[in-house]
């Protein structure tokens, strides 16, 4: 049985978030949560909450043993980019890009 959770339009760079996501892909749920707890990256806290939400979804679906869950798939897609301008010298302006991410996680039971 599979359960999933999604997090949309998070104000994190997809490139930086993928570094953290790669740490937990394919691991058991407890190992993944412990890895994220000690990660210094800002995205680790949000991914940890997302994993906890996916575990709660699995319990609601009727998962018999939560300890058998593992991270089957987890991926980060780029979202909309917020564009801002900052004033520069001689009447010019420079673009500031503020990227967003969509994070999706799917948990499954080990057989």
UniProtKB/Swiss-Prot annotation:
Name the Gene3D superfamilies on file.
Answer: Ribosomal protein L22/L17
Species of the source: Citrifermentans bemidjiense (strain ATCC BAA-1014 / DSM 16622 / JCM 12645 / Bem)
Q: How does it assemble?
A: Part of the 50S ribosomal subunit.
- Its domain of life reads Bacteria
Q: Does the keyword Electron transport apply?
A: no
Pfam families documented for this protein: Ribosomal_L22 (PF00237)
Q: Which residues cross the membrane?
A: none
Record NCBIfam families: rplV_bact
- UniProt family annotation: Belongs to the universal ribosomal protein uL22 family.
Cellular component terms (Gene Ontology): cytosolic large ribosomal subunit
This one is known as Large ribosomal subunit protein uL22
Q: Which GO terms describe its biological process?
A: translation
PROSITE patterns, alphabetized: RIBOSOMAL_L22
UniProt keyword annotations, A-Z: Ribonucleoprotein, Ribosomal protein, RNA-binding, rRNA-binding
One GO MF annotation is: rRNA binding
Instruction: Read off the lineage from the record.
Output: Bacteria, Pseudomonadati, Thermodesulfobacteriota, Desulfuromonadia, Geobacterales
Query: What does this gene product do?
Result: This protein binds specifically to 23S rRNA; its binding is stimulated by other ribosomal proteins, e.g. L4, L17, and L20. It is important during the early stages of 50S assembly. It makes multiple contacts with different domains of the 23S rRNA in the assembled 50S subunit and ribosome. The globular domain of the protein is located near the polypeptide exit tunnel on the outside of the subunit, while an extended beta-hairpin is found that lines the wall of the exit tunnel in the center of the 70S ribosome.
């Amino acid at each position: 049985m599979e359960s999933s959770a999604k997090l949309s339009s998070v104000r994190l760079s997809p490139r930086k978030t993928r570094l953290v996501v790669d740490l937990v892909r394919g691991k058991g749920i407890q190992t993944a949560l412990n890895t994220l707890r000690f990660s210094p990256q800002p995205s680790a806290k949000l991914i940890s909450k997302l994993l906890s939400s996916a575990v709660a979804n699995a319990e609601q679906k009727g998962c018999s043993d939560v300890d058998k869950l593992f991270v089957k798939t987890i991926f980060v897609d780029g979202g909309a980019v917020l564009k801002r301008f900052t004033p520069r010298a001689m009447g010019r302006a420079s673009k500031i890009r503020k990227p967003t991410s969509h994070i999706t996680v799917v948990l499954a039971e080990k057989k």
